[in-house]
């Protein structure tokens, strides 16, 4: 098949796809599919010759919001491809927050040691971790959590049991989880139903010792409500790889909070994305040409 890579030329990824017998072309009108690796505003108008879109990102909610996702072409994302990297980063965020790394960093002084000793918490100490959005990343995270002997709760749309989770609940039957878990990990796709799912109401149901970790999408959290909850002690802390707004402005109060750990959307990196998406694209091409559902095909109605 002929493909166009847009808007950025990733030579290593291109080499993998071409190594599978496919040809990169410059003009989208000559292509059978597009490998898209940009931001939503950069997405081009699709001519009728484009049969499918391979996106390099795990979720295409930004493209859905922009209104460019439709049934004129088939769509595939990179869901689950970054399970190892994002799950490992999530473990790092959880531990950094519970071990109060931000408190020490902001204090810039050894004198903070008594405060850390008195308030530091331990993941292995009878904790319950709720994973909201237990897809490929969530399943890998469950595996990585096993050595900590935590109780795990998976929350998904269907309520179908998630491998490795102690309990699984459908989203509409998980109201009790807000009061039960010690750590909440958000890996949900961004939809109308999940937009600002963490807000003043749900934060108010959490334990004062609860920690919120977001490696999914920034708008899963109402940021103003989170700031209020962190300031008034409604919850203990947050660890954020994604934020709303993003990038988070340098002057934003979250940067100065000693109960918040922030990483700049680096739970997965471009280097890893480029290394992995070529092989995924080859697999999806093979399935597409066989008339089968692609490995990471998106339901364009649901948006994920």
Curated annotation (Swiss-Prot):
Family: Belongs to the D-isomer specific 2-hydroxyacid dehydrogenase family.
GO molecular function terms attached to this record: NAD binding; oxidoreductase activity, acting on the CH-OH group of donors, NAD or NADP as acceptor
Key word Oxidoreductase present: yes
Enzyme class: oxidoreductase
ATP-binding found in the keyword field: no
PROSITE patterns per record: D_2_HYDROXYACID_DH_2 (PS00670), D_2_HYDROXYACID_DH_3 (PS00671)
Active site: 217, 246, 265 (proton donor)
Name listed for the protein in its UniProt record: Uncharacterized protein Cgl2355/cg2587
Binding site for NAD(+): 136-137, 215-217, 241, 265-268
InterPro entries registered for this protein in UniProt: D-isomer_DH_CS, D-isomer_DH_NAD-bd, NAD(P)-bd_dom_sf
EC number: 1.-.-.-
Taxonomic path: Bacteria, Bacillati, Actinomycetota, Actinomycetes, Mycobacteriales
Keyword vocabulary terms for this entry: NAD, Oxidoreductase
Origin: domain of life: Bacteria
